[in-house]
Amino acid sequence: DNKYPATAAEYLDRLKHWQAAIHTDGFSFDYHLMTFPYGGDPSFLKISEVVYEDMKGLKTVGLNGNVSCQLQRLLLPTSLPNYAMAAALVGGKTYAETETEYFAAAFGKDGGAAKDFLRKSESFYLSDAMRGKSDDKSELFRAIDDYACALDEISAYPFAPSGETEKLSVKLLKRYVETEKAFLSTYRAKCEGRDITAAREKLFGFIDEGEPEYERFEDALFKKDGVKGWL
């Protein structure tokens, strides 16, 4: 039977038969951090938790590691996805503990504020209104308004980074916030039925202009492809 597996159950069934026939080491090869972080939830929080849980599940199915087929420049707004992957593979903390540890290390005393904002960003992108599960336009515009308020609040937050790590973390978060503001205004215009051709080009121009400074942390091409999915 050369039919390619289509579900997790089918993959696990094949793995079980393979392990019964060949007694050797094994690992997974997966794509968590390829395109989803930009086209799904750019806050990186949901994918970080998914990565963590999947890595923790490897031992359950008899696998000893993971080859992550992913973007190399995946550090904006945070490096949490990679941190969570490593922590799950070699550490003993829960995901919640890992997440708290990361934000404290990256942002110092401002870790709570950074995490709270990104949680609001996650909630916006994973809301029923944004995922097309609700036809209620008023619900969509409420979600947009709430997110706009969250962006304004974090923009006004008095970050006080101490040390190079915290300074870089704040810089990358602020870049994310500015990009999200440009995106949200364009997305609102689209939802209102207005022509967004010029606004979209301005947004993409903003991403391109920042590439020389942020290319070590974000892949501009994939970022724009993710944004196009919403616009």
Predicted regions and their residues:
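Catalytic-core regions of glycoside hydrolase
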Residues: 1-100, 173, 190-231
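Alpha-helix capping/termination and helix-coil
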Residues: 22, 59-62, 106, 110, ...
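Generic serine detector
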Residues: 28, 43, 48, 68, ...
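Active-site or pore-adjacent capping/gating segments
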Residues: 80-138, 142
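Mature N-terminal, pre-catalytic/accessory segment of carbohydrate-active enzymes
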Residues: 101, 111-116, 122, 134-231
